């Protein structure tokens, strides 16, 4: 029984282990021959990676490769492939291909869905890069035969990684244009690109070169080369053409009996075939056929000169058409130089005997005579006078057609500003740049315009900030003007005196509890020490009547004296105490001097009790316009009464209309002596 349980537990353990261990993916039944299909790692869904040892299996597959798990990558490296045809078209879901370490010279057709492509260690040239898919994201082109970068690379808008090292890169103006696009798109390069050409920049990174400098240098180098050729007096292409003409003419004229193919060259001045000669535009090849048949008739019997002249005269129209064509080609500046070389030798041209034979000046007979008379071919003057396009007589008047629009463009410099009339693939508008160039050049003007706009925006923000700063400072300055004005800090309009309050005691001065709502005397400040305050009167001289009332502005009694406190310390019911400063005021010697002399020497308003009034504003408790003791009251000079010393007065009007002001005499209490004892 125990053995049965042990076997059951062992079987259960094996089942659990088998389920927990990941089994390798099966090779699909439809996997191509010579290929291994494996499950890719680090993918969200199952995808197959195809590793092939040859392309035989993919070529034998007639239809699209189908399997339950799609194939997203393939490895065809180290197979010595020279060309890749439509093999990758059979894998529609392919996104990555490794074609490295082959001998590929042409890519063929690649899938449009490719995202990653490895082409290092191949033999690809720059022209083959135009066939690359435009949706590539990662491209490796190391160790190839790439010399420059075509503008078609700027169409790969999804490209974010590119490798171009170990290539003989020519850092030309066009290549640097593509470089600017790559830098603008922030395309990552692990290995730097080193320039191989121009020679003066060999070994330098292409990031160190400026496109404007290279473009200008290429243009200047071309102009310098053209000037040097002009200074030499000849152009290489024209000189070589003239020498070849002389050699060909010598070969044609030296042999008396030659084959028709050799004699056919005399009809047309031999030179390098031009595009205008190859494609005439008329579509008629009859002239070419007649040109080939003409030597057969003239060279049939080389010894019979007279018969050949008759045959040549019998068909003048054929020769006339060809001569006109040859003359047009020479006049178009093809570079043969035949006309320019014959002009200095008119005498030598007239020596020939063919001119005397043909009285009408027909060039056909003169063109045929050198073949009949080999003795005349030895004279170089005779050869050049009749074979390079210089005709005597009135042959120029017999031009049946004029083809001035056909201009040879062999010597046209494509880098100069000259317009070209040659049509290669289709109609080209020289005033418009191609879309590739516009796409590649759109980066730099955009950067310049955006930089200008950013600069203007920054300047505008600075100006607006300065204006706001000045405005805020100005507002703060205006708002603090009142705070800086000492007289304008606490402005309170002085109201008219309420005469109903006069005569009331202090504790009933308009308030039931005898307390002021706000203190009339503020805190002592530094200005208090600067005020000139009269020294208090002596105790014996300070006599304040019991019925005298203080002023409402808090300046105390009229004479500025203080009430002597009773000895018992208990004030009488009818006594009041004027408001005195909280802190002792400094005594001035001048104030004390005036206080001692005012009782004897002065009388105010003819009153005997005028001693209680100060003789001078400086000696009494004079309240100026602004005082720390009355800081919250502002009195204007035009509103202050005369005399300025506050006192209790009575005003009356005389018969003459004058106002008479009389100070009220203080009432001396009768009980003051009793309380003193």
From Swiss-Prot:
Gene: wdp
GO cellular component: membrane; plasma membrane
Ranges of compositional bias, category Basic and acidic residues: 347-372
Topological category with respect to the lipid bilayer: Single-pass type I membrane protein
Keywords noted in UniProt: Cell membrane, Glycoprotein, Leucine-rich repeat, Membrane, Repeat, Signal, Transmembrane, Transmembrane helix
BP-aspect Gene Ontology terms: negative regulation of receptor signaling pathway via JAK-STAT; negative regulation of stem cell proliferation; positive regulation of endocytosis; synaptic target recognition; tissue homeostasis; trachea development
Residues that carry a glycan: 53, 80, 145, 170
Nucleus recorded as keyword: no
Function noted in UniProt: Plays a role in negative regulation of the JAK/STAT pathway by binding to the receptor dome and promoting its internalization for subsequent lysosomal degradation, thereby reducing JAK/STAT signaling.
Disruption phenotype: Homozygotes are semi-lethal with a few escapers displaying no visual phenotype but showing disruption of midgut homeostasis under normal conditions and enhanced tissue damage-induced midgut regeneration.
Annotated segments matching region Disordered: 264-285, 298-317, 325-385, 502-523, 539-677
LRR repeats: 91-116, 118-133, 134-156, 158-183
Residue ranges annotated as Extracellular topological domain: 21-451
Description of how the protein assembles with itself and partners: Interacts with dome; the interaction promotes internalization of dome and its subsequent lysosomal degradation.
PROSITE patterns to which the protein is assigned, alphabetical: LRR
Biased composition (Low complexity): 595-607
Polar residues bias spans: 374-385
Places the protein is found: Cell membrane
Protein name: Protein windpipe
